[in-house]
Structure formats: C-alpha cells, structure tokens
C-alpha cells in the first residue's frame, strides 16, 4: 500500500484542488493507497474542507490543536506510519503548496522499484532537474545547505556519487527501513521541530545502510499559493546546531 503523507498549515486554498488531483493520479496507477494529512494548528477552513473531501477520497486527518512545527508534525505522521503499516508499504511525503507535481509519482515509483531502493529523493539539483521561478535567496540557502552537508557527511547514491539534494520534501520511503530506524532511535528518530528534519532524517537513514538515491524533478515554485511558512534564517541556524549534534554522534 502507498501512504501519501502531508503536513498542512493554513493550506485550504491549495488542498481543495491538491487532494483530488493527488488521489486521482494514484488511482490511475491502480495502486492501493491512503492519503494521511496532519493539520498543524491551522486556523483556516482546512479541517472542514478535508472532512468534506473524505466523502470521495481515501483520506485520514490527524488534527493538531496548536502549531508544533513541520518537523514535529511529520514526526507524528511517521509515527502513525510505523505503527500502522506493513513492512512492504511505501510512504510518500508531499508538500501542500502546489510546488510538487503528482504526475511525477509514477516515474519515482518505477525508479524506486527498479533499483530496489529504501529511500528516494525527488531532487532539484541533480542532472536534468528543472527549477522554475525559485526565489534567488531561497535557492542560495537551499543549495548552500546541500553543499555543506555533502562535504560533512557525503551521503552516497547507489552510483557512488554524492547526493545533491538534502532538503527536498518530495520523497519515497520504504516502511520497513523506517521501522528499523524507529527501533534504534525510538522517540528520537526525529528531533528537529522544523524544516531541518529533512536533513536529520536523511542522514540517519543513510547511517543504517539504507539503499538510497535521487531522481530529477520538475519543480515550479511559481505555482505556489499563499505565503511561505519557511523561516529561512531561523532554519539555517537550526541546521548549524543540527550539524554539530550529528557530528558528535559520528
């Protein structure tokens, strides 16, 4: 089964079209699936909208009364996945802001299965990736983050090349490997409360010999609706602290 996991903070205007599009795309693949979405303390119409969408789509809602941050919201989602999924299930993480294209899931799944992967990143920075309308300041921070992580940790793809994109949220995970990490780390498998959880989880999965890779993605930031929730400077400093913690545990 495919478990599509999303975290939403005041994303009602996007969810109204995203959930049907995502659901219809997975249905076209003939796969058994469920969409699980964590509402991270939203104060818009997200909950009522999703409740209505449940009538026509396999949708599970995990509402949080107060905002706890992207990382901890995904920790809630991954805990749900680990506790209530079969080993051969796959989890696909997906952003709610319209920048991820559901039509690329088929290509990602094909590559994942063909190469017997445990973890796949939809990459914005590897060869043949396409990024449109990505703000210069965000591209600089994101690319700089990945370069720092490449030099410190050098996570390797199945080809032996260094992984290029450490922060993309568009990913496929093998649930069996998530359970293995959870058994080792227990409640500490994700400790970062915000965006930097993407780096933390990737590095921890690499350290338990996950078979991982990345695949080019078409990423159109111009399709994004609503104000960005990403606090760039705060997350950059959180990343520096995370790097120190991970280095100590090498």
Which residue stretches match the model-derived regions?
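Short helix-capping segments at alpha-helix termini
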Residues: 26-31, 54-59, 85
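Short beta-strand/loop segment that forms part of the nucleotide-sugar
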Residues: 31-42, 64
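Hydrophobic/aromatic residues located in beta-strands of well-ordered beta-sheets
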Residues: 4, 35-37, 61, 91, ...
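Acceptor/aglycone-binding surface of glycosyltransferases and processive sugar-polymer synthases
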Residues: 62-80, 90, 102-191, 222-230, ...
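Residue-level preference for short helical/loop micro-motifs built around acidic side chains
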Residues: 13-17, 44-48, 72
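A conserved acidic beta->alpha catalytic loop
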Residues: 39-48, 98
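Short beta-strand-to-loop acidic/aromatic patch adjacent to the donor-nucleotide binding site
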Residues: 85-99
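Hydrophobic helical membrane-anchoring modules
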Residues: 1-6, 13-24, 28, 107-110, ...
């Amino acid at each position: 089964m495919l478990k599509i996991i999303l975290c939403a903070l005041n994303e009602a205007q996007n969810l109204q079209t995203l959930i049907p599009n995502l659901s219809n795309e997975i249905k076209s693949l003939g796969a058994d699936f469920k969409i699980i979405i964590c509402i991270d303390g939203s104060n818009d119409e997200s909950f009522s909208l999703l409740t209505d969408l449940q009538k026509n789509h396999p949708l599970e809602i995990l509402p949080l009364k107060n905002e706890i941050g992207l990382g901890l919201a995904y920790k809630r989602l991954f805990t749900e996945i680990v506790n209530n999924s079969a080993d051969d299930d796959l989890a696909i993480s997906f952003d709610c802001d319209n920048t991820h294209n559901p039509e690329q899931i088929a290509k990602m799944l094909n590559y994942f299965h063909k190469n017997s992967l445990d973890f796949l990143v939809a990459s914005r920075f590897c060869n043949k990736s396409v990024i449109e309308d990505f703000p210069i300041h965000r591209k600089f921070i994101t690319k700089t983050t990945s370069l720092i992580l490449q030099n410190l940790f050098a996570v390797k793809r199945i080809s032996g090349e260094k992984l290029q994109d450490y922060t993309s949220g568009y990913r496929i995970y093998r649930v069996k490997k998530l359970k293995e990490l959870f058994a080792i780390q227990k409640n500490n498998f994700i400790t970062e409360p915000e965006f930097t959880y993407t780096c933390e989880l990737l590095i921890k999965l690499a350290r338990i010999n996950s078979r991982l890779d990345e695949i080019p993605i078409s990423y159109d930031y111009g399709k994004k609706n609503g104000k960005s929730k990403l606090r760039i400077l705060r997350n950059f400093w959180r990343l520096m602290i995370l790097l120190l913690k991970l280095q100590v545990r090498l």
